[in-house]
């Protein structure tokens, strides 16, 4: 039941944010009484905390499961495409919602962000090849991270308004433009 509560809470928090999600919403989503939630969790903050933790664990697991050993420009393109469009949309939306998380969770969220950024940095650096890329390592990483953050923000809206297929087509054009910026001619 604890896992089901968190799974449903992730959906609710991703759609309504922390403030918009109530314990009533969560209890109804798992067909239990609100009082029964307290058997499993102390309060809404604890449920949110666990939801955020699961979100970051999902991203790290996704990164580690979905890379391949093709550390080329084509491999980078495939990696970016997977990391944007194959991630469960609930986690993208929850990630975007973190900017309005309770202040009491700021240090935990910062820790999770640092952990995911380290994992992502370590994965992206494998694609860096100075014989093909005109930027230094840090500029390369920063440009890719900026691109991903922008796409996650955009994808959260695309999912909401049902235009994800159009976004995939634009992504192809934009990632080629991005790659052309830092590829040596």
Curated annotation (Swiss-Prot):
UniProt gene name: icaR
Residues that span the membrane, as ranges: none
Domain HTH tetR-type residue range list: 1-59
Assembly and oligomerization: Homodimer.
Keywords attached to this entry: DNA-binding, Repressor, Transcription, Transcription regulation
Name this polypeptide is given: Biofilm operon icaADBC HTH-type negative transcriptional regulator IcaR
Other information: Binding to the ica operator DNA involves two IcaR dimers and is highly cooperative. Two aminoglycoside antibiotics, namely, gentamicin and streptomycin, show an inhibitory effect on the IcaR-DNA interactions. Consequently, by interfering with the binding of IcaR to DNA, aminoglycoside gentamicin and other antibiotics may activate the icaADBC genes and elicit biofilm production in S.epidermidis, as a defense mechanism. The four antibiotics kanamycin, tetracycline, ampicillin and chloramphenicol do not show significant effect on the IcaR-DNA binding.
Pfam family, any one: TetR_N
Induction: Repressed by ethanol.
A molecular-function term among this protein's GO annotations: DNA binding
Function description: Represses transcription of the icaADBC operon necessary for biofilm production.
InterPro entries referenced in this protein's UniProt entry, alphabetically: Homeodomain-like_sf, HTH-type_Tx_Regulator, HTH_TetR, IcaR_C
Gene inactivation effect: Cells lacking this gene display a 5.8-fold increase in ica operon expression.
Organism: Staphylococcus epidermidis (strain ATCC 35984 / DSM 28319 / BCRC 17069 / CCUG 31568 / BM 3577 / RP62A)
Portion annotated as DNA-binding: 22-41
